[in-house]
Amino acid sequence: MKDLLNLLKNQGQVEEFDAIRIGLASPEMIRSWSFGEVKKPETINYRTFKPERDGLFCAKIFGPVKDYECLCGKYKRLKHRGVICEKCGVEVALGKVAAERMGHIELACGLAHIWFLKSLPSRIGLLMDMTLRDIERVLYFESYVVIDPGMTTLEKGQLLNDEQYFEALEEFGDDFDAAMGAEAVRELLHAIDLEHEIGPLREEIPQTNSETKIKKLSKRLKLMEAFQGIGNLPEWMVLTVLPVVPAPLGPLVPLDGGRFATSDLNDLYRRVINRNNRLKRQLDLSAPDIIVRNEKPMLQEAVEPLLDNGACGVAIIGSNKRPLKSLADMIKGKQGLFRQNLLGKRVDYSGRSVISVGPTLRLHQCGLPKKMALELFKPFIFGKLEMRGLATTIKAAKKMVERELPEVWDVLAEVIREHPVLLNRAPTLHRLGIQAFEPVLIEGKAIQLHPLVCARYNADFDGDQMAVDVPLTLEAQLENGALMMSTNNILSPANGEPIIVPSQDVVLGLYYMTREAINAKGEGRVFADLQEVDRVFRAGEAALHAKIKVRINETVKERDGSVVKNTRIVDTTVGRALLFQVVPGGLPYDVVNQPMKKKAISKLINQCYRVVGLKETVIFADQLMYTGFAYSTISGVSIGVNDFVIPDEKARIIGNATDEVKEIESQYASGLVTQGEKYNKVIDLWSKANDEVSKAMMANLSKEKVIDREGKEVEQESFNSMYMMADSGAGGSAAQIRQLAGMRGLMAKPDGSIIETPITANFREGLSVLQYFISTHGARKGLADTALKTANSGYLTRRLVDVAQDLVVTEIDCGTDQGLVMTPHIEGGDVVEPLGERVLGRVIARDVFKPGTEDVIVPAGTLVDEQWVEFIELNSIDEVIVRSPINCETRYGICAKCYGRDLARGHQVNIGEAVGVIAAQSIGEPGTQLTMRTFHIGGAASRTSAADSVQVKNGGMGASRNLKQVERADGNLVAVSRSGELAIADEFGRECEYKLPYGAVISVKEGEKVEAGAIVAKWDPHTHPIVTELKGTVTFVGMEENITIKRQTDELTGLTNIEVLDVKDRPAARRHTLRPAIKMVDAAGKDLYLPGTDVPAQYFLPANALVGVADGAQIGVGDVIARIPQETSKTRDITGGLPRVADLFEARRPKEASILAEVSGTIAFGKETKGKRRLVITPTDGSEPYEELIPKWRHLNVFEGEQVNRGEVISDGPSDPDDILRLLGVSALGKYIDNEIQDVYRLQGVKINDKHIETILRQMLRKVRISESGDSSFIKGDQMEYPGAGRERASASEDKFISKFTRVLLGITKASLSTESFISAASFQETTRVLTEAAVTGKRDYLRGLKENVVVGRLIPAGTGLAYHTERMARRDADKPLRVSASEVEAALTEALNSSGN
C-alpha cells in the first residue's frame, strides 16, 4: 500500500522550470528517447487484435495495452509492476506510458529534413552557400557534389553531372572525393568549420555596398553564430535516425466489417518502413549502384510527407481522396495541437440551455433549472450526503440522487449557497462575455438571466443559448465571487462608462412616468413631502403626469466630501417625485426632474457610481429596473396601425418633386445637361423631398392639441406610442418611423450606387411589386455583409489579442517623463472630444501651468479624476502632456503610471492587470458593428460643397501659426505657406485653430479682435493659385504658342486666357527642352530674387495651369499670376469601417501615399526624366541637398523656392504611418493612428478609450532597427526589442561606440510573429516557419506572456497568477544554493551534446 501511495505522489510532481529551449535533435538523442526500433510496417494482427511485435504498435516498445498486464498474460496485477516478461518482452506498467514512450527507425541512409531544406530561406542552403535547386539535384541523385577536391582543379561544393564526374575520374583518379544524395550533403555540413567561416564574414559585411549582398551575408552570419553559440551541429539537419511517435497518437479504431479507422501517420510511417527495409536488403545484397540510386530518393520522398505533407509540391492522398495529415499538420491551424488542445480545452462540469427573462432576480443572481443544478453539482451532493450520514457509500448516494429523494433537494440547496457559477454566451468577444452569478433554483428547463446584463452578453431571448460552468476549487470560487461577479463589473473596460444601463421596456417605463401632461388630474397641487405624493397617487387623486409642487429634502455630497442637507420646493410631476424615492441619498433632485431618456438614465447611473459607490449603485440599478417594468406595464403603450400618422403634406411634396424631375428629364433630352448631372440633380431632389416628408411627419407625430385648465387649446408633446418609444431611446428611430409613416426614399444597388427612382410609398400604405423588388437589394446585401463581417472582425480580434497578450502591468512607475501632448479633438472648428474627456484617468507627465503664469496648478504624477477634469476646464487649459503606454520604459510589461486608471474599476490600475488583452478585446468587440463597405464619395450619400472660407465660431484675438504671409497693396494678407493655421484665442487664451490653404486672402491682422461669426479668410476652392511675393514686371520664359501654351478666348467676356499644355500634347521634338515659367524682373530688366534667398524669382508652371497676366505686366506683392485647376469632383474611394481599422493596425502602406519632406529646407526642381520630376531640397543647415524623383502625375503642393519643414506634405494623399514615424516621431504617429481609428469608431457611435489603441501601438513599436552597429555584436539592419536597446545603450561602457537604432513600426501580424516567445508565435500563424527558425537558432522561451504559460499548463502571470509566479521566484531564490543555475545546466548539456555528436 505504501508503494502505491508513493507511486501516486510521484505522478503528480510538477517540474519547476523557467524557460523552454528548442533545438535540433542529434541521432544519439533520438535513440536515447527511444524504447526500441520499429522494424515492421504492420500495426496489429487482424485476427487476434494484438499489436505485432516490432511493428508500429509493438507493446515491447511502447508499453502494455492493458494496465499492469503483459501481452501474453503471464504477469497481471499491480504486484508485478516493473517486471519485464521473458516471453513477450513487455514491461508490466500503466497502459498510459504508451503515450510518452517513443520508438525509432534506423535509416539505411541519411535524409535531409524537409523543414530545414524547403522552409524558406533554406537553412541547409544558407550554411553550405548553395542554392536550393542545386541541393535538390544532389539529394535526388541527379548530380555529384565535390566533397573534398584534394589537389585537383575542382572546387569544394561544385556540382558535376554524370559525364563531368566520369571525366574527372579519368583525369584525377582518386585524388578527389565526390558523392551524391543526402550523405554527401551531410558530409559537407560536417566539414563546415564555423569558427573559421564567421571571422571573414564579419569583416566582409562592413566593406560591402550592395544592400542585397549585406542582407544575404548577415543572414548567413546570424545562422552560423546561432549554430556556434548553442551546440547544434549542422549535420543534424540531415536525419540518420527517425523517431516514431507513441502509438496512442496514431490510434486504431475498429469499424464494422473488419476494417480499421487509422491515423494517417500510420500510413506515412508504413511507407517509410517499407522503403527503408527494401533499401537495407538491397545494400546487404550489395545490389547494383543503379538500383540503390533509384531507391534512396524514394526513401527521401517517403520521409518528406511524413514530416510535412504538401510542403514539397503535391501532397500524398489517402484512400479517402484527402491529403494525409502529417506530423506538421498535427500542430498547425485551428484544428492543430496548439489551438485545439493547448490554448483552449473543453471543460467538464458544464451545461447549456436556452435563456429566458428573469425580471424578479437581483443583479447578482441567475435562475438555474433544478435538473441542471443536480447534474452539475453531483460530486458535491454525494459528498454532503455521505458527510450527513444519509448515505453510506458513493453508490448509495448515487441511487438517492437518481431517485430524487426530498433530502437530495435540501442538500442541493445547501451546496449551491454562495457557490457562484459562470454564465457564458458565445461568441465571447470581451471579458464581460463570461460572468459569475449566484444560482437560484427554479422549475422549468431554461436558465433565467437578469435583464440588465443582456447588454454585455449581447443576449436577447429569441432562442439564445448560454453555457453554465462550475468553478470547483476554493480559489476559483473566491475569484468568481470577488472579481467576476456581475455586480463587480458595472463599468465597461472599453470606455469606463456604466454598462448596466436599462434598455427597451425599462427605459419606456421610466420615460413614461417622468413625462408631464397638461391639465392632468391633480395639476397645481402642493405636497408636503414625497410620501404624501405617493399616498395621493395610490388613492387615485392625482395622475402620474400631473404638474405639482412638492417639498423635498435632499442630501448633496460636496466636492470635498462633506454632505450638505437642504430643503426646497420644486416644480415637478407626480411620476418624478415617485421615482426620486428609489434614488440613493447624495444625489440632487435635479437628476430626475426631466423626462428620463436613455442618455439621462445612463448619466444618472454613472453619477451614482461616482458619488455613492458600487454597492448602492447595484441596488439602485435593480430598483430602477423593477420600477421601469412596473410603469411600462401600467402605461399600456402599444402599437396600432393608427399610430403611424401619414402627414397631409406628403402628396404635395412628392408631386412637386416629380414635376421637377420631369423638367430635368426634358433638359436632358434636349441635351442641356449631361447624364451625370441629371443623375446627381435627381438624387439631390429626392433626398430633399424625403427630408421634407420626414420633417412634416415628425412634426405631426411629436405634437398633439389638448385643452388646458382655462379651456384654451394648447399644444403639448405627443403621447403617441411610437413617438414615445423613439424619443425615449427605448427602440426605433426617426429613420425607421420615416419608412413606416413617411416615405422609404432612395435605395442603393448592391454595388453602392443609388437608384434614381425612389420608393415614394411607406409600409403603412404598402409597396408596389417594383418598389418591393428594389428594396430586396438592400436587405440581402445587409445579410451577406453581416456574415462576412463577423469572420473578419473575429480575425482582427485574434490578431490584436496575439500581439498584446504579453502586456501586463508589472510595476508602479517606470520613471519616464515622456508623454503625449493631449489637445481637444477638433473637426472643422467643432470640438468632437473635449480635453477633459481625453485626459480623464491619465497620469500627468509634466507640470501644468496656469495660462499666462508660472504657477503649477496640476503637478506631474497626478492621476486625473472627474474633479481634476472640472478644475482643468475651469482654468481653460488647452493642452496637457500625459503619460502614455507608447512611451513606457518598463522592460517586460508596462507600468501603472503610464497606463493610468483601470477603466472598469475607476482607480489606478493594479499590478498584474492584463491590459494588453483588455485593449485587444475593447477594440475587437465592437468590430462586428463596423461597416464593411468602402464608401464612394459622390452621389447623394455624402456630397458636401467644398469649403471656401473660414468663419470664426467664437470671437477672440487673431494670431497665426506656422504661417508665411505677404501683404497686398489693399492691406489684406495672402498666405504663402502650406500648413499654416489661423488661431483665434478667446479671453482665457484657449485657441481654436483653422487651417488655411496656400493663397488664402486673410482679412484679420495679428492681434486684431474678431467677432464670432465673422469671415476671416477666403479662397477659391476650385483652383490652386500661384502667388508672387515680389513687386515687379512679368516676363514669360519658354512659353511658345501651340508648343508649350495655347491661348483661349472666352466668347462671352472676350478675355484671353493662356493655358499651359500637358507634356504629352507638346510636339515631340521640343517636348523636354522648353519649360514654361514666369520670371520676375525689376524695371531695369534684372532678375529679382526671392526674399531672403539667392534663388531667382522664377515660377515654373505645371501642366494645365491658367496664366492670368500678360507678358510685361506690372504686378504687386500677393497678386495671383497663375491658377492651377483642382479636380474637386473626382470620386476617390475612401476605405471605411473594419478594413480601415485593419489596415491601420497592420501598418500597411497606402496606395499613392502622400509624399513628405525628408529634410527642412528650400525647394528646387532639378533635371526631369521621362516620367518623373526631380525634387531637390537644399537643407537650411547647409548639409547635402536631398533629391527625390516624383512621378509627373502626382500633384505637388510646393513651388520653386518655397521653404518646407521636415515632415510637411509635398504631395497630397493618404498618410503612410512609416513616414510619420520616421520624420515626425513616435508621438505624431500615436496621434495620427489614434485619431484615424477613433474616426471610424466614432462614425458608428462606439466609444473606445484612446489608451487601448496606444497599448496596441506600443506592441507595434516594440522593435528597433540597428542603423550603426558600433562595437556591439549586432549587424546593421538587425532588429531587437526597444526597451532592451535602451538598456544596451545605457550599459555600454564609456569607450565603446554605442550602436545607433531607429524605431520600427510593425503591423500586428508581423509583430506577433516576431515576439521573443516562439511558443506564442508558433501558436499564432506560420507554425512551420516559426518553429524551424527557433530550432535552428536554439531559441529559449522564458514564458513571460500569457499564451506561453497556458500552453505549458501553468497559471498565467497576470492577475492572481502574478502573485503566484512572484512567490515562486522568491522561493526559488531562497533555495538558490541547493540548485544549479540554468546557464550551468545549459553549458553541461552543450558539452554532452558536442561529445555525443562527435
From Swiss-Prot:
GO terms for molecular function: DNA binding; DNA-directed RNA polymerase activity; magnesium ion binding; zinc ion binding. Zn(2+) 1 binds at C70, C72, C85, C88. Zn(2+) 2 binds at C814, C888, C895, C898. GO terms for cellular component: DNA-directed RNA polymerase complex. SMART domains: RPOLA_N (SM00663). Binds 1 Mg(2+) ion per subunit. Binds 2 Zn(2+) ions per subunit. Its EC number is 2.7.7.6. Gene3D superfamilies: 1.10.132.30, 1.10.150.390, 1.10.1790.20, 1.10.40.90, 2.40.40.20, 2.40.50.100, RNA polymerase II, clamp domain (4.10.860.120), RNA polymerase Rpb1, domain 3 (1.10.274.100). It is an enzyme of class 2 (transferase). Keywords: DNA-directed RNA polymerase, Magnesium, Metal-binding, Nucleotidyltransferase, Transcription, Transferase, Zinc. It holds the Pfam family RNA_pol_Rpb1_1. One of its GO terms (biological process) is DNA-templated transcription. Mg(2+) binds at D460, D462, D464. The keyword tRNA processing does not apply. Its cofactor is Mg(2+); Zn(2+). The keyword Nucleotidyltransferase applies. It catalyses: RNA(n) + a ribonucleoside 5'-triphosphate = RNA(n+1) + diphosphate. InterPro entries: DNA-dir_RpoC_beta_prime (IPR045867), DNA-dir_RpoC_beta_prime_bact (IPR012754), RNA_pol_asu (IPR000722), RNA_pol_N (IPR006592), RNA_pol_Rpb1_1 (IPR007080), RNA_pol_Rpb1_3 (IPR007066), RNA_pol_Rpb1_3_sf (IPR042102), RNA_pol_Rpb1_4 (IPR007083). HAMAP family: RNApol_bact_RpoC (MF_01322). DNA-dependent RNA polymerase catalyzes the transcription of DNA into RNA using the four ribonucleoside triphosphates as substrates. Belongs to the RNA polymerase beta' chain family. The RNAP catalytic core consists of 2 alpha, 1 beta, 1 beta' and 1 omega subunit. When a sigma factor is associated with the core the holoenzyme is formed, which can initiate transcription. This is DNA-directed RNA polymerase subunit beta'. The gene is rpoC.
